[in-house]
Amino acid sequence: MNKPKQILRLRKRAEFLALRNGEKRRGPLFLLEVRERTEEESQTAKIGEKPRAGFTVTKKNGNAVIRNRIRRRLREAVRCHAGRDMAPSTDYVIVAREQALTAPFSRLTEELSRRIKAKGERRGDGKRRTERPESGPVNGK
């Protein structure tokens, strides 16, 4: 069996906030925020090319026991399966939804791998790729 690739963890608030401006990939089980690090950021943190992952489970998902269970499932899915798909010098934040607890583990890992591999679905600046057409005059006026 292949040894899983080492994935470092995001732990500081500033690291999580930096990803708010990154690309967002939405799914039914979680939201994935992705951002490539600059060389300067990698050297400052002394982490090199390794990918980093952070996990967020809000209180909306339940009490501490439920939130920790969701976080453990996501960590294991990244460690065993999805970590192989992570790009070097990239940070990922996984914001869990309630369904991440009840979904089969195989679906969780498949969805996570698919979202990690998908590139450029959104611009990351909160804007849509195509602008909506301007509204014309109402009733010909």
Curated annotation (Swiss-Prot):
EC number(s) given by UniProt: 3.1.26.5
Q: What are the UniProt keywords, alphabetically?
A: Endonuclease, Hydrolase, Nuclease, RNA-binding, tRNA processing
Matches recorded under PROSITE patterns: RIBONUCLEASE_P
Q: What class of enzyme is it?
A: hydrolase
Which intervals carry biased composition (Basic and acidic residues)?
114-134
Mention one GO biological process in which this protein takes part, according to its record: tRNA 5'-leader removal
GO CC, sorted alphabetically, is: ribonuclease P complex
Q: Which family does it belong to?
A: Belongs to the RnpA family.
Q: What does this protein do?
A: RNaseP catalyzes the removal of the 5'-leader sequence from pre-tRNA to produce the mature 5'-terminus. It can also cleave other RNA substrates such as 4.5S RNA. The protein component plays an auxiliary but essential role in vivo by binding to the 5'-leader sequence and broadening the substrate specificity of the ribozyme.
**Assembly, per entry:** Consists of a catalytic RNA component (M1 or rnpB) and a protein subunit.
Recorded protein name is: Ribonuclease P protein component
- Gene from which the chain derives: rnpA
